[in-house]
């Protein structure tokens, strides 16, 4: 079974975000082993880089505004290809200050959800839902319409 790691900097303060992430992690557990690695915020993105890089396993996808934008279907295809080749996946979300260039350059892939900026806590929910959606698309579910 594929492993999905959500490597995230900082803690979620709002319970409704925590509950939403937990719900999608639970749903994802049908398809993959899910681990959320919450790392402490540093003074700046560079101060967080070493710990982020140590926490990443397998194919690393960093969320970055300059990354490639994918449709849900294309993300599903990418996830299927990674699963077919036996690769675990680490998704990285930085703190409110973003990710260091070192982390972005070390990533296998940079993914962007939008040119807009979102709160990093909300991005955890959006990312968890989109990863779940990718698995549901690959399973042929009607979840994605």
Spell out what each predicted region is.
Residues 6, 61, 94, 127:
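Conserved RecA-like P-loop NTPase ATPase core
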Residues 1-24:
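N-terminal beta1-alpha1 ligand-phosphate binding loop
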Residues 31-90:
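S-adenosyl-L-methionine/SAH cofactor-binding core of RNA-modifying enzymes
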Residues 23-31:
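A short, Lys/Arg-enriched amphipathic alpha-helix followed by its capping loop at the start of a domain
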Residues 7-9, 37, 92:
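Short hydrophobic segments within beta-strands
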Residues 12, 65-68, 95-98:
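Short glycine-rich anion-binding loops that position phosphate/pyrophosphate groups of nucleotides
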Residues 24, 78-82, 106:
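Catalytic-core regions built around general acid/base machinery
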Residues 101-145:
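Structured adenosyl-cofactor binding patch, chiefly the S-adenosyl-L-methionine
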């Amino acid at each position: 079974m594929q492993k999905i790691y959500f490597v995230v900097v900082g803690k979620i303060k709002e319970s409704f975000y925590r509950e939403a992430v937990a719900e999608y992690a639970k749903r994802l557990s049908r398809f993959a082993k899910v681990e959320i690695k919450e790392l402490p915020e540093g003074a700046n993105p560079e101060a967080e880089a070493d710990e982020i890089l140590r926490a990443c396993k397998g194919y690393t996808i960093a969320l970055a505004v300059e990354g490639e934008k994918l449709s849900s279907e294309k993300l599903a295809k990418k996830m299927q290809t990674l699963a077919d080749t036996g690769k675990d996946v680490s998704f990285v979300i930085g703190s409110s200050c973003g990710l260091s260039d070192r982390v972005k350059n070390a990533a296998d892939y940079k993914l962007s959800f939008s040119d807009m900026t979102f709160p990093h806590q909300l991005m955890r929910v959006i990312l968890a839902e989109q990863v779940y959606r990718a698995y549901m698309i690959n399973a042929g579910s009607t979840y994605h319409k």
